[in-house]
Amino acid sequence: PEPTGDIKRVAILHAGGLAPGMNTAARVAVRLGIARGWTMLGVEGSWSGLADDRVRELSWSDVEGWAFKGGAELGTKRDIPPVEQFYALGRAIERNEIDALLVIGGMNAYLGVHAITSEKDRYPAFQIPILLIPASIDNNLPGCELAIGTDTAINNATWAIDRIKESAAASKRCFIAETMGRRCGYLTLMSALSSGAEYMYINEESPSLEQIAADADRMVASFKSGRRLFLTLLNESASQYYDREFLADVFNAESEGIYDVRHQALGHMQQGGSPSPYD
């Protein structure tokens, strides 16, 4: 069909940390745009890719198989475009005749879009529709109830923790698992609920030394009562001082030889894999 309205060429780029479902969102946007008669463009390498003119047209078949593919086929970076890059971005938008920009990403994408739209009076090329689709395992974007990728990250974390529990339950053991999420405790909270964790430490309620000591006392008492496994989840930014190694040292020092302590960061596996059906 012939394009309607002023929009004819739409560019898609990823920005911020990787989130499962980024490819799915891009695929839907490309095919919906083509169905409306628009020319859909893919920007490789996020904002710096746009500044360097790494822009190519995406056809219907180019996004074949992206529906359940993990990663980000167009590439993504956490960089927020600096002021020095605005001129290059504006020129790239003009050269490629981009009528609208669709950004898929998390908090850094949000900050990047805000930085660009704040300068639209100085750079006429930025006076185009710019839309952000929230995609972040952290689920920390303003005005967004649930970002793309969050559900998959919770499933990934729960899957890993379940296997940790099977291993730890074989002997009396306290296990501390560190989740991602930056300064937002949503991923840690939901993973704790779904995995049945006894303790949870998040940035919103940063733990104190007194709380950790009291928790250690309660844990020792529970092991003396016959408990075989004690699971603790820790957000990666829960505390500036009390990280998982510190918690492990405290819990181990108070163990009285009744149990042993292990700790593990779940790491980037929370960002990987195919998106869940919900995402």
For the regions a protein language model found, what residue spans apply to each?
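Glycine-rich oxoanion-binding loops at beta->alpha junctions
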Residues: 1-4, 50-99, 108-110, 137, ...
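N-terminal phosphate-binding or glycine-rich loops at protein starts, especially the Walker A/P-loop
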Residues: 3-51
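A short, small-residue-rich loop immediately preceding and capping a beta-strand
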Residues: 9-17, 22, 99-108, 176-177
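Short, ordered loop/turn segments at secondary-structure junctions
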Residues: 15-17, 43-49, 78-79, 106-107, ...
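Short acidic, glycine/serine/threonine-rich loops at helix termini
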Residues: 22-26, 51-57, 85-87, 112-117, ...
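Accessory alpha-helical/coil subdomains and C-terminal extensions
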Residues: 40, 92, 100-105, 111-127, ...
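Catalytic, metal-anchored helix/loop core of enzyme active sites in primary metabolism
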Residues: 259, 268-279
